[in-house]
């Protein structure tokens, strides 16, 4: 027997909400089958009038109770700083703050990077995002609750369900998409403290990242229609791997499309299988355009916030349609007390070098690859569009620029001092490229000279054909098919360990397929090396 249905985080029901989750839409069906007279209570801490109206209509709520949003004692500040300057500001000021807090970032890569910098500066910090082991995340939360660590550097993955009554500060390393996103996160500070503060920084990379999130917040119309046609042609139950093999989209996008189609009744799911229903379906492109435009307006509002000369609290509350608004008297614009942005120049230089050394490991693909044909562990020099990856992006955009000496020297330093693979490479080869073949070869020749090993020209060639760029292949089924039977390895290549160079790595399938052929020719070890890692960097 149902006495009361409580829906927490009710903003997730609304397509206008900052954290819309399609599965929450199924609650409408639950409400409709409740016994007559069973009350429904929908709760949310952060929602503007549009979200409230949407939730009210969907759930069928008769009355609305709305309290004031302002958090007394929460001092707000905002400023613009470059990447290196933000790192230095954090490492300089965090040790002076009482208690513990959160630094919010937009991407998993930034969470890892900022946490690593803080650790190297002697600050107790942990990264927190969806790729952190699920068993480790509760441990990080508890250590933050117990104030055993100074700061957690987190994506919005540290969100719903986390309640720390004594957080002293919340700092945003980058600007979130909307006022609702921001207020939900900064509002975690000082819930049981008299005084707390929130600092928002705007960086040059914010716009590109937020635009990507907005553009990918809904499934792609063409891909969704393609998926529905696949289900119609299949005529029965299929698994997700079958969908991945048929629709050229990333796994995350496939999951999102499947969820939307199930909620919309276009397909049904039982266990791990899906099939088309008899229900009519069409892609609602009008609502997608409307919501996307609204998100652009919300992003513009956050740009205004950074430049706001009046009360910052008042600005946020008005944007959230709070009827109980007044000036706070304690934000930077009310008090006249602004952030101290003076920074130690040698430390900024150190941070700039740290950002350029944004390298990582290229783990070999193991599944379905025979053990004696697998690559060894490789390295990438940078993240796409970050640090030295900015130079790689410039060459991809304009090949005439060429890969400069700084990339050669940095690659040599990484290979000889940080990586030092054993047994060491005895020759160098490059992945054939239609667009950057000569530029990549010129880079490889200079690097080989610095490493004092030979560069073997034409060790690997590409068969004639009209091949699609690998970057357009969105999941492993398409990525592997696109490079299989595409390359030829010369039968008389050296048998010693090889440093196999490509400009950019994403899926690792190009390295994997060429590596398999090299190993079949008797090459002792294949070490992949890429100038930039583009995975997750779009």
Language-model region placement:
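Helicase motor core with emphasis on the C-terminal RecA-like subdomain
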Residues: 1-229, 241, 267-276
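Active-site signature of alpha/beta-hydrolase-fold catalytic machinery across serine-
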Residues: 54, 442, 446, 513, ...
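A short, structured active-site edge motif that brings together acidic residues
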Residues: 67-69, 130, 429-431, 455-468
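Active-site-facing substrate-recognition patch
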Residues: 74, 348-427, 436-437, 441, ...
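Acidic, metal-coordinating catalytic cores used for nucleic-acid/nucleotide bond scission
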Residues: 108, 132, 429-440
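Acidic, divalent-metal-coordinating active-site segment for phosphoryl/phosphodiester hydrolysis
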Residues: 112, 504-514
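PRPP-dependent phosphoribosyltransferase catalytic core
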Residues: 335, 350, 354, 512-538
